[in-house]
Amino acid sequence: MKMTRRDFLNVSTAAAVVCAATLLPVEKAAAAQQTLAAQNLLEQAYLYAFPLVIMDATRTASTNTRTATSNKAPINQFIHAEKLADATTRAVVTPNVDTIYTQAFLDVGAEPMIYGVPQTDRFFNVQVLDAWTNTAAVLETPGLYAITRADWQGELPEGVQRIDVPTTMVWTIARIVLSGQEDLPNVRAIQDKMQLMPLSAYQAGGWTAPTGSYDPANDFVPVKHVLAMDAKEFFDAANQLMETNPPAAADAPVLRELAALHVGLGEKFDDKALGLFSGLRWKLMLLQLKKKLQSESERYTRQMGQWIYFGDPIGNFGTAYTYRTMVALRGLGANTTDVAIYPKTDVDSTGTVLTGKKTYTLHIEADPPTLEKGFWSVTAYGENDFLIENPIDRYCVNDRSGLHRNPDGSIDITLSKEAPADTTNWLPVGEGDFHLFLRIYKPDAAALTEWQPPVVRAN
């Protein structure tokens, strides 16, 4: 997928020769404008469809198994994680060490799926995402829910609450907070009480989960798999997925434009629509994508002292298509800001990059304001966005860590590679540069405006 210097020179030279040989100056300008318009439309189509295609690739990889395991399960079955992330975890970047996940990819095309949320004594919620990575619902109250395609017509049993999703493909992510490894048995007991089965099986009084299937070709990393697709493979997949996962009504204006490329519901993609040098044009677009996404992300960045985080409309993107793709690339399945925010900092109070060559104090004047069952944590990551190996296997500090507090209730956390004399309030870091994520679940939005964010100072 990488464009070589030779590729770039070839496309540039070929285009120049054609223009010089056949076009007058005015015609050259018109041709250049036409080429730019075609390139912009191609980029627009890719940014629009990417979340749908990456969601399906994630579903394919996550359900590629005959039986349920701790990281895969057949369609309509739970994937119960069994342990917290550590320094060896490489499945995702910036892994969370506050919660255990239970996920499931659902197909609600034939009938609703019944989802049972158990009674718990802790933070527990279920994010329900549609195929376009939007949050359709968040389930928190114990009870039975019918996750249903919005156009389904039928009767539900008494006491079962209907949850409409506009697409056939659904991804559910349950997050269960825990206090550490010793709390895992309690989390597993909660997982055992969760229920998932088709409506017909629920009405029949029980269900034996069917055996899935395994294909070695589907053992891929979803992001790498999608980024390696050529134009035809990508847009063929997008068009096919739209048949069962229709675009939102608000997408009509952009789809009218994308019809010129034969991208959309009912369309059949033809790469001839990309014109001359379509393959190289595709590669060039992918090379320029990172810059485009970085620029777009800055529009949605929110400042919190020396920390920044991504704000609304994260998790429910509407027509913010570029933002939606940026989030899908960086962290598929992002929460809405009423559920959680993730402020990040990679600098100290003077704006200097954080490094393991120094020792710092993270001063928390007051705990982040949260609603009932909310919680907070601070996690350190290395330059590669993974957890940092350390002698005490500590990757974060949080409101469950038993931290020593100052007489005024504030907290001082030592950030360093070498252990201090008292390690109670120590968050280990590595030798190189590092950054911190402050996770706040169920934030009190009103109180956050007056809350003083933590400050990192070099000692």
Would you name each region that the model predicts?
Residues 2-7, 16-33:
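N-terminal twin-arginine translocation
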Residues 32-459:
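A compositional/structural signature for long, glycine/proline-rich flexible linkers
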